[in-house]
């Protein structure tokens, strides 16, 4: 995760010793579990959209998630492991996360969850634009032919998914598409904000603080705008209550723990690459469980979009390898000059 300059860093060995002893098959299992958790959330939220409004959905799910993360934050505070600067650093990421979450959840009332999750790939466009402006060291990568080709395929593919349903003229569908785009771009801004402001903080503590801010904001929004000020959830049947609880537990609480563990064990590139399969998993399950399907043209557009995303990720990975080789060469030359003296 990312941060303000001068933030207190948590040594890697303090956070990932157990992960480093994890077998590769265990790392793969964690990554698959992450994909399963995050693929289940759009299905739960889409089902619940028939029973509660999105303000109530967000307030209860993120409120419960904030309570889940609260003990970790309090434990870190008690040990003196939580720098005071983290509270200010987390404000911008939390605002971006809150707005993106509102768009994400409300979109489920209007569009197929598979269409929405394909639309979320647009976060890579927001990340590219933001990284070009904020991180000069990445401009060469973003200007590369592979990266730009990937972005082009991504945008073209997502346009095929969003516009290929044949009913864009319907107001509700147009609103859903706009919300899907807003959610994708919003999560991209959130990722940039995390990288810019949260660098150096332990990822679990960083997300814990962001979850507290986001949960508090969404609970306040629920009380202000939700039907019955959020009390509508008390009218849900036992099955829908289970779905609401599972969507919070699997998607926000456990899902993020698994995600960070997968990154630590399998690496960012592998983790991000596997998670590009999410729209296909969601689309398949939505067809089976909800009877909601995409057209053949939309599936084709989705495949083009994911291929573009994979090309972008491969360009980033190639740039990381080049930087690592350059750093190793500089260190070797410095060591040689030192020994010559």
Whereabouts are the PLM-identified features?
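C-terminal-most transmembrane helix of multi-pass membrane proteins
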Residues: 2-13, 20, 62, 137-138, ...
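Glycine-/small-residue-enriched transmembrane alpha-helix faces in small-molecule transporters
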Residues: 2-59, 92-95, 99-106, 151-152, ...
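Specific transmembrane alpha-helical segments of multi-pass solute transporters/efflux pumps
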Residues: 37, 42, 73-120, 155, ...
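Membrane-interface helix-cap regions at the ends of transmembrane helices
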Residues: 43, 47, 51, 65-83, ...
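Specific alpha-helical transmembrane segments that line the substrate/conduction pathway
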Residues: 56-67, 105-142, 183, 268-287
């Amino acid at each position: 995760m990312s941060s303000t300059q001068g933030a207190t860093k948590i040594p890697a060995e303090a956070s990932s010793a157990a992960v480093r002893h994890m077998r590769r098959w265990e790392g793969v299992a964690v990554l698959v579990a992450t994909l399963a958790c995050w693929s289940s959330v759009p299905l739960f939220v889409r089902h619940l959209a028939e029973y509660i409004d999105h303000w109530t959905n967000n307030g209860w799910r993120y409120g419960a998630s904030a309570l889940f993360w609260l003990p970790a934050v309090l434990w870190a505070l008690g040990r003196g492991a939580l720098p005071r600067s983290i509270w200010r650093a987390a404000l911008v990421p939390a605002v971006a996360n809150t707005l993106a979450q509102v768009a994400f959840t409300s979109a489920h009332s209007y569009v197929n969850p598979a269409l929405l999750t394909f639309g979320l790939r647009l976060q890579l466009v927001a990340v590219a634009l933001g990284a070009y402006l904020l991180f000069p060291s990445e401009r060469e990568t973003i200007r590369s032919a592979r990266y730009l080709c990937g972005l082009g395929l991504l945008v073209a593919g997502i346009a095929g998914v969003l516009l290929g349903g044949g009913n864009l003229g319907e107001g509700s569908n147009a609103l859903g598409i706009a919300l899907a785009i807003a959610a994708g771009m919003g999560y991209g801004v959130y990722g940039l904000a995390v990288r810019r402001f949260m660098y150096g903080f332990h990822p679990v503590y960083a997300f814990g603080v962001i979850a507290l801010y986001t949960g508090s904001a969404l609970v306040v929004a629920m009380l202000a705008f939700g039907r019955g000020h959020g009390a509508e959830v008390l009218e849900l049947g036992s099955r829908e209550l289970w779905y609401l609880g599972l969507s919070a537990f699997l998607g926000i609480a456990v899902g993020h723990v698994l995600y960070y563990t997968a990154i630590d064990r399998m690496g960012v590139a592998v983790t991000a690459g596997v998670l590009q399969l999410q729209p296909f998993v969601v689309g398949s399950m939505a067809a089976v469980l909800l009877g909601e399907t995409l057209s053949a043209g939309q599936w084709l557009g989705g495949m083009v979009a994911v291929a573009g995303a994979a090309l972008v990720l491969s360009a980033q990975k190639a740039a990381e390898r080049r930087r690592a080789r350059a750093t190793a060469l500089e260190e070797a030359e410095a060591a040689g000059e030192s020994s010559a003296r």
